[in-house]
Amino acid sequence: MVFSSNVLEHVPDPMGLIEEMIRATRPGGLVYLSYTNWYSPWGGHEMSPWHLLGPRYAERRYIKRYQRKPKHEVGANLFRVHVGPVLRALRARPDVEIVAARPRYYPRWCRLLLRLPGLREVATWNLMLIMRRVG
C-alpha cells in the first residue's frame, strides 16, 4: 500500500505525485490518497475561506489580522488541486481501478456529491480515494 494524506495540494506537480504513487505500487496493491481541494471552504488552509476571493486578497487579509504572513503561499507550497480533473485522469488510466471515492470526514452517503460536477468542488472538503493498481 502507498499512502498519502493531505500532501497532494502541497506539491507543484500533483499529477506527477499520483503517477509516482501508482508506479511504486505492486500490481493488485492499493493506493490511498486524500487531499483538500481548492474550491472547498478549507482549500486555502489558514487563509480559508477568503482564498475563494483570490489568493492575494486572502493573504492580505491574513496579514492584516495576524500581523504576519501565512505559513502557506499559493504557488509556492500550496497549489490549486480540483476534484474533477483528478477523477477524470484516474478514470482514464487502464492501470488503475478506483475502489472508493468519497468526501473524507463526511458520512458515506455523501459520496453521491462526487456525481455533481459543480457541487463536488465546493462541498467536498477533502477527497478520499482508494485505488487498486491493475496488471
Ranges and model annotations:
Residues 6-10:
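A short His-aromatic
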Residues 12-20, 24-26, 30-129, 134:
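S-adenosyl-L-methionine-dependent methyltransferase catalytic module, highlighting the catalytic core
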Residues 3:
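A conserved beta-strand element that flanks and buttresses the S-adenosyl-L-methionine
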